[in-house]
Design a protein with these regions (language model features):
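Bacterial N-terminal signal peptides
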Residues: 6-16
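Enrichment for repetitive, rod-forming helical segments
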Residues: 9, 80, 311-312
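Penicillin-recognizing serine hydrolase domain
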Residues: 24-45, 53, 119, 149-319
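Active-site-adjacent loops and short helices of periplasmic peptidoglycan-processing enzymes
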Residues: 22-189, 199-200
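Positively charged n-region of N-terminal signal peptides that target proteins for export
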Residues: 2-4
C-alpha cells in the first residue's frame, strides 16, 4: 500500500511539471479575456511560438480547426519553394494563364487578384510574388495548373506535403483557400508548423517573397499600371516584421499568420477570429510586442491556454 501510495504521489508531482500545452483546455467562457502574465486577449484563436527555442509562449484554441482563407496560400508557396529547391522547377519557368483559369479567378469574383490577363505567360518568380504580396487567387490557380495540370491534382500534392511536414489537423481543397463548402480546414498549431518549416527549409525563398512592400502587375482600364500594397498588416509598421499572410472569411473572421525577428530572435504567431482588419492588426502588434518582451527559454516557455469561442457564422469573403 505504501509503495502504491508513493508511486501515485510521484505521478502527481511529475504531472504538475508537464507542459501546459499537453493538457486539454476545458474552460469554455466566451466572454472573459484570457490572461497570461501581463498578456490578455479577447481573440478566440491565438498561438505564439519562439522559433529558436521552440517554446510556445501563448496558446488559445490552437487545435480548433477553421477555414484559413488566404493563409492557405502559404501552403501553396511551400509546395512551390520545395519544387524549386529540388530543381523540379525554376523561377524563370513560365506558365500560361488559361482562359478557364482567368474566367474563374479574375477580379470579377470579388476576391484578391494580381490582375493576370488571359493567355499571359508569367514566370514562377512573378507568380510567387503575386501569391504572397497581393494574395492573388489567380496566381495560386495558375501555379496549380502549370505544375500539376489542374487544381485538384495540385491540391492532392498540397495535402501530401502538409502531412509530411507534420500538419496533422489540416486539409486543403483549393490552392488559394477560397471557401469550398468546409473542405479546407487548418488549426493554428498546424499553421505555426507550416510557417516554421517554410522559414527553416526555404530561408532564401522566405526572404525573397514574403516582405515585398508592393507589387506592380497589370494595367488598369484607363491604361495605368496597377500597383498594390502588401496585405501584411504589420509589415513596415512593426520593427522586424517580415511575413507571412492574412486571411478573412465570415467563418474565421480576420486572421493572420505572421513572423518577426529582432536581435536574432524570431517569433511566429497566429491570430484568428478577429472582428475587423484593424482589430487583427492591433492584436498582432500587441501579441508580438508582448512576445519579444517575454523571456523565451525551453524551461519557462510552456503554453498558456485560455478559453475558446465556438460560435462562428459560415461564410464567404476572402482576402
Amino acid at each position: 500500500v505504501k509503495v502504491a501510495a508513493a508511486a501515485l504521489a510521484l505521478l502527481a508531482v511529475n504531472a504538475a511539471f508537464l507542459p501546459v500545452a499537453w493538457a486539454k483546455d476545458n474552460r469554455t467562457s466566451n466572454t472573459a479575456p484570457v490572461s497570461s502574465a501581463s498578456y490578455a486577449t479577447q481573440a478566440p484563436i491565438v498561438m505564439l511560438k519562439d522559433m529558436d527555442s521552440g517554446a510556445i509562449l501563448f496558446s488559445r484554441g490552437a487545435d480548433k480547426r477553421f477555414g484559413p482563407a488566404s493563409m492557405a496560400k502559404v501552403m501553396t508557396a511551400y509546395v512551390v519553394l520545395d519544387l524549386l529547391k529540388r530543381g523540379e522547377l525554376t523561377r524563370e519557368t513560365k506558365f500560361s494563364v488559361g482562359e478557364t483559369t482567368w474566367k474563374k479567378w479574375n477580379s470579377s469574383t470579388g476576391g484578391s487578384t494580381m490582375f493576370l490577363s488571359p493567355n499571359e505567360k508569367v514566370s514562377v518568380d512573378d507568380l510567387l510574388k503575386g501569391l504572397i504580396t497581393v494574395s492573388g487567387n489567380d496566381a495560386a490557380a495558375v501555379l496549380a495548373v502549370g505544375i500539376d495540370g489542374g487544381e485538384d491534382a495540385f491540391v492532392k500534392r498540397m495535402n501530401a506535403v502538409a502531412a509530411s511536414i507534420g500538419m496533422t489537423s489540416s486539409r486543403f481543397g483549393t490552392p488559394n483557400g477560397w471557401p469550398d463548402g468546409g473542405i479546407t480546414k487548418v488549426s493554428a498549431a498546424d499553421l505555426i508548423t507550416l510557417a516554421d518549416r517554410l522559414i527553416r527549409d526555404h530561408p532564401d525563398g522566405y526572404a525573397r517573397y514574403f516582405s515585398i512592400p508592393k507589387l506592380q502587375h497589370g494595367i488598369s482600364p484607363d491604361g495605368r499600371p496597377i500597383v498594390q500594397a502588401n496585405r501584411n498588416p504589420i509589415l513596415g509598421r512593426f520593427d522586424g516584421a517580415d511575413g507571412l499572410k492574412t486571411g478573412h472569411t465570415r467563418e474565421a473572421g480576420y486572421c493572420f499568420l505572421g513572423s518577426a525577428e529582432r536581435d536574432g530572435r524570431r517569433l511566429i504567431m497566429v491570430v484568428a477570429g478577429m472582428t475587423s482588419a484593424k482589430a487583427r492588426r492591433d492584436e498582432a502588434q500587441r501579441l508580438m510586442d508582448w512576445g519579444f518582451a517575454a523571456r523565451a527559454t525551453a524551461a519557462t516557455g510552456h503554453a498558456r491556454r485560455g478559453s475558446t469561442s465556438a460560435s462562428r457564422a459560415a461564410g464567404a469573403t476572402h482576402r
